[in-house]
């Protein structure tokens, strides 16, 4: 898998950018207008989603118009001087920010400063030509992004979700080792947990991308159910990772477990790890028995703590109670994941029987 990623250097967006640039140049040559500004606009208009291409294209056009207008105005009054470049850039940035054209600020500023050295006269004509080239770049890129290799992230999201299940289980396993040793977790575990969070955010971002373009593409009922499944799975995995992060911060070294408590805890966490690696498709009865034991243990610890006097213990939860609470919370998420998967499977079977 890593090997595939390593050599997959040309993605869909790279190919679409090349196609957009090629078509933009052809259109510009056909109408006999300059290509460079159209190409710059075409390159930056290719976005992760077709929706973003349309929205940001509508922002970049007026922004580029502003940049072109400032460039021609200052060149007309000041000529090709350093002050013309500076004023054109400054006024373009300020105006775009004031008008909230943030997505078009960079392109507009580049357009403004690039126009100055290549325009000697006929400033208004140059301004109109710039509008034409900018429009060409935006329209061509948007059409390419919409119709050629349209963005589909469902497979990517599913891959990220599967990876999250496995890596979440791995981090839990690393944390269990530290717990059994009664030592602070290793830096490597903390690093793996941070990578897990990054992967989660990446998957959530892909979900947002897919949702934006959902209305533009046809989907079967099965595809819609699959997308909703991974969306719900990611939401619950996010909560599980949150609880694991709390476990990583819990003061393991202050815990005082009996041998029996430690063994139940070890078996329960091993069971959780196994369930995660199987994507929560099945939870056996033995796991529920272990959870019942942990639940009793949690309330026993909580009640014992309530009898402590304030001068003896000033926290509402002991280290043991915190760890037990987080593990029980993770179990709740696992149950929800199992129910979601069972519902998905039953709907698929029902759909197959209908057809």
From Swiss-Prot:
The keyword Transmembrane helix applies. The keyword Membrane applies. It is a multi-pass membrane protein. It is found in: Cell membrane. GO terms for cellular component: plasma membrane. Its main location: membrane. Keywords: Cell membrane, Membrane, Transmembrane, Transmembrane helix. This is UPF0421 protein BCE33L2478. It comes from Bacillus cereus (strain ZK / E33L). The lineage of its organism: Bacteria, Bacillati, Bacillota, Bacilli, Bacillales.
